[in-house]
């Protein structure tokens, strides 16, 4: 697979697009060399949308105080996240739709269903009952107000976690390409 480094500090559009179109993200935490992975609902906040608390792009998650991920993050704030757009490719078309519509729909979905992004960052459990926690909880609720996901944001023991993004690997299957990004502009080793 070809690989290139994005030397700019700007958050790549492929990552923004993938984060904006996905509902779930895979969170990986670690404690004493024992990894743990969780499928999570999340909120992506582009740079500037979380002022005055955050100026850069960030991701918001929530978890219970008694969860393994909460314990792991409290002990080791380094996390990895995986997000992809493949799920859009599995949506069924309307059985009553015309064959032209079905063809165009499938072609359109195929264009979007080839990217996966691995993000690395530092997770911070926000101070309980702080204005910052209230601010980010509200943003997270606005994203997760449908169905049963709201229960994972509200609640006495639910904590809000902010992840500052440090680096990423963007894999594009169509182009057999891996692009690397680093918030500081440094070259990432992997």
UniProtKB/Swiss-Prot annotation:
Binds 1 FMN per subunit. FMN binds at residues 62, 69. Its cofactor is FMN. The keyword Nucleus applies. It comes from the Eukaryota. It is found in: Cytoplasm; Nucleus. One of its GO terms (cellular component) is cytosol. Pfam families: PNPOx_N (PF01243). The keyword Ribosomal protein does not apply. InterPro entries: PMP_oxidase-like, Pyridox_Oxase_N, Split_barrel_FMN-bd. Keywords: Cytoplasm, Flavoprotein, FMN, Nucleus. Belongs to the pyridoxamine 5'-phosphate oxidase family. This is Pyridoxamine 5'-phosphate oxidase C1952.08c homolog. It comes from Schizosaccharomyces pombe (strain 972 / ATCC 24843) (Fission yeast). The lineage of its organism: Eukaryota, Fungi, Dikarya, Ascomycota, Taphrinomycotina.
């Amino acid at each position: 697979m070809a690989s290139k480094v994005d030397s700019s500090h700007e958050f790549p559009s492929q990552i923004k697009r993938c984060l904006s179109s996905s509902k779930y993200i895979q969170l990986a935490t670690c404690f004493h060399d024992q990894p743990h992975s969780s499928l999570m609902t999340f909120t992506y906040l582009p740079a500037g949308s979380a002022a005055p608390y955050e100026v850069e792009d960030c991701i918001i998650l929530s978890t219970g105080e008694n969860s393994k991920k909460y314990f792991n993050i409290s002990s080791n704030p380094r996390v990895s996240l995986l997000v992809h757009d493949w799920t859009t490719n599995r949506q069924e078309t309307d059985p009553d739709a015309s064959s032209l519509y079905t063809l165009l729909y499938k072609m359109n979905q195929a264009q979007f269903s080839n990217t996966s992004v691995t993000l690395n960052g530092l997770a911070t459990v926000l101070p309980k009952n702080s204005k910052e926690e209230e601010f980010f909880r509200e943003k997270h609720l606005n994203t997760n107000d449908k169905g049963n996901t709201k229960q994972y944001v509200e609640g006495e023991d639910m904590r809000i976690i902010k992840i500052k993004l440090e680096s990423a690997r963007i894999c594009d299957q169509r182009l057999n390409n891996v692009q690397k990004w680093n918030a500081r502009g440094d070259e990432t080793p992997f």
